[in-house]
Amino acid sequence: MPDDFKIPRATLKRLPLYYRLVSILKGKGIDRVNSKTISEALQIDSATIRRDFSYFGELGKKGYGYNIDSMLEFFKSELSESDQIKIAIIGIGNLGRALLTYNFSIHDEMTITEAFDIRPDIIGENIGDVVVKHSDDIKTTLESEDIDVVILTTPDNVAQQVADELVKAGVKGILNFTPRRIKTPQDVQVHHIDFGIELQSLLFFMKNYSK
């Protein structure tokens, strides 16, 4: 595809779903898959899948399905799996500690390498082989370690302040678990994860689409 071509945001958000399914199929020794199978596995309608895949180039032929190896190669390049992605997490409360302990154990390409908090009792603690540093060290550490992706699990009343500091440190992506809808410049991507909203959405679909 042309270098200046941009895949739609909605399609990009589905890439990890496609990649995980294709990886599973590859592990089962399957070399081709059609949109119907993908649709049934992911509960995404076939038309959406075909439209998404039309942005991905020549991954298959009509009547033959999509080539698993070609899809894996494409998804790896788009999701930057060829490079080790270093991530920092800020706010080591219950959620932050759980994420740090888990530390993407099934994703070898992503690793939380830095953790920050302000509480004296947790500074210096080793959690999941990562030593917690004081938040005063965020900017210098992120710059020296060339980290531009951060998970934010701070209290919501300081989330925007921390986000502003992250922008100054050159961060380009924030996964925000706080209730605060933080604001950043256009070149800084923020994904908001709100468990309450996700549960409400789940309950809605259970009520209206499970019959």
UniProtKB/Swiss-Prot annotation:
A GO MF term: DNA binding
Cellular component GO terms held in the UniProt record: cytoplasm
GO BP annotations, alphabetical order: negative regulation of DNA-templated transcription; response to redox state
SUPFAM superfamilies tied to this protein: NAD(P)-binding Rossmann-fold domains, Winged helix' DNA-binding domain
Chain positions recorded as NAD(+) binding sites: G91, I92, G93, N94, L95, G96
InterPro entries given in the database record: CoA-bd, NAD(P)-bd_dom_sf, Rex_DNA-bd_C_dom, Tscrpt_rep_Rex, WH-like_DNA-bd_sf, WH_DNA-bd_sf
DNA-binding residues (ranges): 17-56
UniProt subcellular location: Cytoplasm
Purpose: Modulates transcription in response to changes in cellular NADH/NAD(+) redox state.
Family: Belongs to the transcriptional regulatory Rex family.
Subunit structure: Homodimer.
PANTHER family from the UniProt entry: REDOX-SENSING TRANSCRIPTIONAL REPRESSOR REX, REDOX-SENSING TRANSCRIPTIONAL REPRESSOR REX 1
Protein name from the UniProt record: Redox-sensing transcriptional repressor Rex
Organism (species): Staphylococcus epidermidis (strain ATCC 12228 / FDA PCI 1200)
Lineage, top ranks: Bacteria, Bacillati, Bacillota, Bacilli, Bacillales
